[in-house]
Amino acid sequence: MKEEILQKSLKLFLEHGIREMSNQKLVDWLGISTKTIYKYFKNKEDLLEQVLYLYHDGQYEMLLSLSSEQNAACHFFNVWQIAVQTEYNVNHIFYEDLHHYYPELGKKVEGVIAKKFEEHFLSIIERGIEQGAFRKDILPQVALRSVLTLHRAAVRTEDFKRFGLSAENLLLQTTASYIRGLCTETGLDALDEHIQSL
């Protein structure tokens, strides 16, 4: 029952935002009693925290399912393709609510999950440098921070919504352009061929 509550609550938070989903609305949508929700969660913040971990764990599992046998530039592109596709349809109010009403919780969860995500991303960049897919003169941590910043701006704010881009075009016009700049000629050829095959 707890897992079902988490899964359904995650869907509701992502679609409607956090603030919009009061405990009463949650129990109404979930078809359970308030008593049931408090059996598993201390309060809405506790529920939200566990929902955030569920969300990030799911994303991390998707990343690990990608083949690391492919060219690192293509692998790195696929990572961000999944990220954009996943977050593209999330209501931007979800991120605004998290930042505005639950900033400490957002920082806490980010602090717990960030390290494993960043280590995974950095390992792909470093493998790309070793393979010759990425330029040797790039600083992996700076490159990663740039991609993370660009990604957040592209999918978690309204800045790019006005262009009416599909998830794929948003990726190609933002993050993919930056990834192409990290590439050597060999990496760029492989990446362009990979993108054309999609």
Predicted segment positions?
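Hydrophobic alpha-helical connector segments
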Residues: 50, 61-93, 144-147
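Short secondary-structure transition hinges
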Residues: 88-122, 129-134, 141-142
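Helix-turn-helix
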Residues: 4, 12-46, 50
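Secondary-structure edge/capping motif, primarily at the C-terminal ends of alpha-helices
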Residues: 66, 94-98, 154, 158-161
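C-terminal peripheral helix-coil segments that are non-catalytic and often amphipathic
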Residues: 123-127, 164-198
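Short amphipathic alpha-helical elements of helix-turn-helix/winged-helix folds
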Residues: 8-12, 82
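Short, well-structured alpha-helical segments
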Residues: 77, 122-126, 140-148, 192
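Generic hydrophobic, amphipathic alpha-helix propensity
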Residues: 1-9, 26, 51-55, 59, ...
